[in-house]
Amino acid sequence: MKKILLAGLSAIALLALTGCGSTAGVTSPDGKFIITENSGVVGYYTFSEEITDSLEVADHSGNDIPVYTAALDGSELDEGYEGDGLYFNGNDEYITLDPSVLDGDGFTFAAWLNPESWRVWSRVLDIGNQKEDLWIGMDWSTRMLRMDVLGAKGSVSVLAPLPKIGEWTHLAATIDGGVAKLYINGKLTQRIPCRVKPADIGANVQGIYVGASNWPDPLFHGVMDNILVANRALSGSEIAAVYKGVVAFDEAE
C-alpha cells in the first residue's frame, strides 16, 4: 500500500502522534485526517479488499476490528468514492458494527454516500434499542436527512440536506453528551444541545447497524465508502480534514 510520509507536521501534532494521551487529531501536509493510536478512531472501512464468503470487511484503523455484511446472496462491491465501495441493495444488505464504538464519552460516524434511491425512514445508521437510540435516515415530514438521539434524558432531532441521488456526499455525525451535530461535505449544518451519552445508548443495545434500522424501516439503497467510526466526538476542524481525506493507520509511517 502507498505510504504517506508525515513530514511537515507541527510539534503538537507529533506529540499526539507519538502518544502523550492526547486525542487531538493529526493532519497531513495536504490537510487530510491521519488515524493514529490516539485519534479515537475505532474503525475505518475502505472496502479495498474483496469480500469473501465470510462477509468480513477489513478494518484500517489499526485496531483490527472487522465488521460483517449481511446480504444473503453475497455482498457486492461497486464503484466507490475512492476505489471500491459497498453496495447496499435496499433489501438485506447492512453492516453490524462492533460495540466498542460506544466505549467513549463521545461518538463520531462519517462516510461517503451515493444513494440510488431514498425511501421514507430509510436508514444510514441506527444504534440502540428504540428506547435509547441514535439513528440517521430520511425524515418523513421534511424530506431531509435527520439524526435522532433519544433516551431517558430526553430526545433531540438534528437536520441536514438529504444527499442527492446519484451524487457522492460526505456525511458526518457527532455526539458528546453535550451537543449533537450533523455535517455535510465537511461543513456543520445544525447543532442541538443533547444530554444523551453513548453509554446511555449502549447500556442495553439491540443493534448497531450501518444501513439498517432497529425498527421495521427501509434499508439504505446505494453505495457507501470510507466509513469511519470513533469513540469520541471529532471537532469541526477534524471533520473538515476527514472530508478532505483519511490516511489509514496502515498507510502512515
Regions found by a protein language model. Give the residues of each.
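Positively charged n-region of N-terminal signal peptides that target proteins for export
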Residues: 1-4
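C-terminal motif of bacterial Sec signal peptides marking the signal peptidase cleavage site
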Residues: 16-19
